[in-house]
From Swiss-Prot:
Belongs to the distal-less homeobox family. It is found in: Nucleus. The gene is dlx1a. This is Homeobox protein Dlx1a. GO terms for biological process: cartilage development; cell differentiation; embryonic skeletal system development; embryonic viscerocranium morphogenesis; negative regulation of photoreceptor cell differentiation; positive regulation of amacrine cell differentiation; positive regulation of cell differentiation; positive regulation of transcription by RNA polymerase II. CDD domains: homeodomain (cd00086). Residues 128-187 bind DNA. It comes from Danio rerio (Zebrafish). It comes from the Eukaryota. Keywords: Developmental protein, DNA-binding, Homeobox, Nucleus. One of its GO terms (cellular component) is nucleus. The keyword Nucleus applies.
Amino acid sequence: MTMSTIPESLNSPVSGKSVFMEFGPPSQQMSPSSMTHGHYSMHCLHSSGHPQHDSAYSPAPSFPRSLPYPYVNSVGSHSSSPYLSTVQTYPNNSALAQTRLEDPAPESEKNTVVEGGEVRFNGKGKKIRKPRTIYSSLQLQALNRRFQQTQYLALPERAELAASLGLTQTQVKIWFQNKRSKFKKLMKQGGGTIDTNALANGRGLSTGSPSVAPVWNTTATVKTSTPTSYIPSYTSWYPTAHQDTMQQPQLM
């Protein structure tokens, strides 16, 4: 009798609950809902020997089927787990990820450095051409007069000239560099002779060589002389040819 009563007491619902509490982790506090699900999972293991308790522990249709391990069900009661927190905050992080993708564009603009009139990105050698500076006639005359005096300017002279003309020092420096390069080309082409007046007015840099003007004068004289010699010859030929054609039918 004593041996038969011991298994019955172990198979009772109260004894199953006490066994579940003994084998569960001591530090983990469980809610009543998790305890009921845990007891149901323990009862599923012994349901083959006691079919009469299946109706009392039938699962509700709104709850999913619990796993046989009790500590798995306790995860749902604890919202402070790292996995659940990351899952809950994942939709909120989509806006942050989108803003992070849009951040590199302003950062590349901040890293632009202007060095000597050249724009460089992140210190690399990529250059972007700036629009050309349009000088007025008064500025060009002053720059040409100063270039006739000296081809190289010191820093104080360049600063003074730029301030007087309303230009930057970089613009004055670039203009003098271009002027010197063109002047050297003209010296090579013209054999070292350039009119000083044309250089002061800036005309010597626009023409290819000083010998171009006489060529234009010769072509102009040829064009004016050819029509005078061509028109009388044509008028003298036309009446004779017309008279010959008129006389031939009369002879026939």
